[in-house]
């Protein structure tokens, strides 16, 4: 097996045994970035010097007999996470040259675990988008077909993992931004429960919805990443003060009894939904059958407020974004427009030039929803719908352990196909965004390839803080599902 084909689990075993070195593995992946990223556009910043320095240090630690969970493993980070001394752009002109003085907590934990950071990946600006076409720097292409999008907003991370330019990556998920690109790129993506992973040092889009999570080659790799990045953080007021399990224990006993005793719900509102691609629906049914063969009891459940989810989300998320992004004004840091008449003119011109069209669209939407006279009509109603959606999931989980659905209504669409149709783009989040509003975990696992050679994923949702059941079911599907994606032919 070539070095770039190693999973995180496989690379870790070979590193600790001395069969490979972190420097060789890191060099191999940096060479792939150099060879392929001009076509893919997965990265905004590549830190080759820093990565090789960290890899050399990891090799020295291994030679001394030291061990750490991710020692010598090359990873990538979505460029929404602060990295000390390495620019963090959020794929926006307004932060094009911003270099943080501190690491996000998740980044700190990765470094403490011995990880090697190869670079920062592309995204839709500030995480606002579903295709990674909204970056101020360049678009990212799907490794399986360069004419198609990789999904978004964590499209750079998903494309980098799929193209074997890093062993694993971190993304962020506000309405499906880990799970949807993972599905489109044929990799595994986990959005943890809200509060499971510290948000400190993540540049906020919608603070009550955002969550950091792993994008990996396998479900086991996702569990290994979760063991490192999860846990309470006093720096983050939304971080949950709960015990952290060993997520790899989710797979204990699988070989002996499969998934016997697990009960999965399929929301009746998702069956035959308008806009659902027939291939996606067929792949979803086949994946459910695989889980049934492993012992899962599949039942019918209801999420009755599904039809209101997209509308509510696209009031709540832009409202929070309009507040979070109000801090970017050209005064203390980031881009500042020159040649302005006065302070107010500088504010206006800086924000007009610094933000892209989709970000400005959502700021306007959010500001309108929060304005006097409209707050109760829009934000208030959307908040009440969110409460109803949370109650729907709570009631459904009284009947089952996990909930199954497609990840996206269609496989990855062509670049430019929906760029002028934001409503169609927003509706593509119908299966994923409810999990963010409910704060529950969601996993995207590859389950099929379309007839046009594009990956399709299955989404597995669980009760809040029950990532274990989600990972266990995902592992079962991964072990038994035929026709899973291999390596893109770059």
Swiss-Prot record:
A GO cellular-component term linked to this record: glutamyl-tRNA(Gln) amidotransferase complex
Q: What does the UniProt keyword field contain?
A: ATP-binding, Ligase, Nucleotide-binding, Protein biosynthesis
KW Protein biosynthesis (keyword) present = yes
Family designation: Belongs to the amidase family. GatA subfamily.
Q: What InterPro entries does the record tag this protein with? A: Amidase, Amidase_CS, Amidase_dom, AS_sf, GatA
Q: Catalysed reaction per UniProt?
A: L-glutamyl-tRNA(Gln) + L-glutamine + ATP + H2O = L-glutaminyl-tRNA(Gln) + L-glutamate + ADP + phosphate + H(+)
Q: What is this protein called?
A: Glutamyl-tRNA(Gln) amidotransferase subunit A
- Going by the entry's taxonomy, the superkingdom of the source organism is recorded as Bacteria
How it assembles, according to the record, is:
Heterotrimer of A, B and C subunits.
The protein's Enzyme Commission number: 6.3.5.7
Which HAMAP family did the record assign?
Answer: GatA
Q: What is one process in the GO biological process aspect for this record?
A: translation
Q: Which PANTHER family match?
A: GLUTAMYL-TRNA(GLN) AMIDOTRANSFERASE SUBUNIT A, TRANSAMIDASE
């Amino acid at each position: 097996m070539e070095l770039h084909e190693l999973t995180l689990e496989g690379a870790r075993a070979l590193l600790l045994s001395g069969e490979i070195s972190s420097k060789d593995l890191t060099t191999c992946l940096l060479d792939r970035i150099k060879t392929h990223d001009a076509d893919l556009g997965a990265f905004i910043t590549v830190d080759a010097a820093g990565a090789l320095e960290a890899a050399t240090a990891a090799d020295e630690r291994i030679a001394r007999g030291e061990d750490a969970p991710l020692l010598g493993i090359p990873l990538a980070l979505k460029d929404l996470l602060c990295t000390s001394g390495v620019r963090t752009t959020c794929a926006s002109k307004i932060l094009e040259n911003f270099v943080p003085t501190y690491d996000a907590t998740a980044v700190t934990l990765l470094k403490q675990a011995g990880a090697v950071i190869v670079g920062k990946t592309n995204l839709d600006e500030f995480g606002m988008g579903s295709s990674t076409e909204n970056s101020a720097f360049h678009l990212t292409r799907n490794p399986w077909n360069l004419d198609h999008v990789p999904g978004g907003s964590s499209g750079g991370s998903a494309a980098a993992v799929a193209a074997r330019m890093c062993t694993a990556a971190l993304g962020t998920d506000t309405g499906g931004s880990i799970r949807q690109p993972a599905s489109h790129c044929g990799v595994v993506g986990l959005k943890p429960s809200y509060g499971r992973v510290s948000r400190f040092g993540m540049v906020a889009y919608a603070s009550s919805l955002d969550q950091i999570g792993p994008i990996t080659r396998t479900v086991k790799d996702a569990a290994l990443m979760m063991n490192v990045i999860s846990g309470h953080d006093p720096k983050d007021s939304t971080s949950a003060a709960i015990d952290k399990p060993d997520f790899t224990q989710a797979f204990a006993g699988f070989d002996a009894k499969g998934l016997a005793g697990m009960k999965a719900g399929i929301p009746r509102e998702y069956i035959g939904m308008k806009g659902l691609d027939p291939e996606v629906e067929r792949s979803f049914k086949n994946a459910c059958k695989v889980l049934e063969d492993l012992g899962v009891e599949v039942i019918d459940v209801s999420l009755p407020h599904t039809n209101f989810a997209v509308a509510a989300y696209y009031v709540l998320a832009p409202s929070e974004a309009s507040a979070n992004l109000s801090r970017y004004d050209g005064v203390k840091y980031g881009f500042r427009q020159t040649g302005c008449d006065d302070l107010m003119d500088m504010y206006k011109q800086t924000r007009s030039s610094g933000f892209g069209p989709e970000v400005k669209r959502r700021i306007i939407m959010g500001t309108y929803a929060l304005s006097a006279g409209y707050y109760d009509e829009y934000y208030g109603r959307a908040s009440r719908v969110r409460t109803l959606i949370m109650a729907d999931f709570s009631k459904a989980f009284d009947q089952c352990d996990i909930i199954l659905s497609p990840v996206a209504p269609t496989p990855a669409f062509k670049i430019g196909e929906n760029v002028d149709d934001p409503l169609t783009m927003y509706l593509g989040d119908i299966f994923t965004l409810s999990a963010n509003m409910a704060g529950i975990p969601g996993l995207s696992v590859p389950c099929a390839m379309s007839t046009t050679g594009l990956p399709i994923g299955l989404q597995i949702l669980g009760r809040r803080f029950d990532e274990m059941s989600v990972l266990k079911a995902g592992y079962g599907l991964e072990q038994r599902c035929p026709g899973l994606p291999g390596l893109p032919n770059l």
